[in-house]
Amino acid sequence: MNRKTLFTRYLHNLTEVARRGDAREESFYASLEDLLAQVAQATGRAHVHVTTLPKSTEAGNPDFRLWNGTDSIIGYIEAKNPAQENLDHIEASEQLHRYRWTFPNLILTNFLEFRLYRHGELVDSVLGARPYVLNQLRAAPPLENADKLWDLLERALAESK
């Protein structure tokens, strides 16, 4: 499956969840977990496992853990509800500050925008689709920046060697 098709399917899945009208943040987790697994597979990293709601860490409870399935943590993901259209406020929060400086490879996302941090510093940010279209119009948002989003996710997974 090519990148555009993969991301378009992901956006369609998010839209289906959003249209129900009763979705919480956790309702979107399966779509992201599936996307991450497919990107890992497509980039030759089939050994990467995605754990949703992993056990607590010294810094708190991020929503996802990426790991090799045995002994090596690749990174963590903190997800926020797609209704949280501006991640700047989250980025400045005490919670994310803790995560950024504890986890050397971290993604912050509202399922549409993805921000990659390495050792606490923002190294990449990609808007894959407009939250307004999903949240207000309840329509599948058009895919934007597919190649850049692919590169960000591949870069995050690259820690898996």
Where in this protein do the model-derived segments appear?
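Generic alpha-helix structural propensity
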Residues: 23, 27, 31, 59-61, ...
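Short, solvent-exposed secondary-structure boundary motifs
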Residues: 41-42, 53-57, 94-99
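N-terminal start-of-chain detector that recognizes signal peptides
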Residues: 22, 34-39, 48, 77-80, ...
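A broad, low-specificity signal for short, low-complexity segments enriched in glycine/proline
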Residues: 22-28, 37, 65-71, 77-78
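Charged, often low-complexity linker/regulatory segments
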Residues: 1-42, 51-53, 158
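Active-site metal-binding core of divalent-cation-utilizing nuclease and nuclease-like domains
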Residues: 44-71
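Secondary-structure boundary/capping signal
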Residues: 40, 44-47, 107
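Short, basic/polar, glycine-containing "phosphate-handling" surface segments that engage DNA
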Residues: 1-18, 69-73, 79-97, 101-161
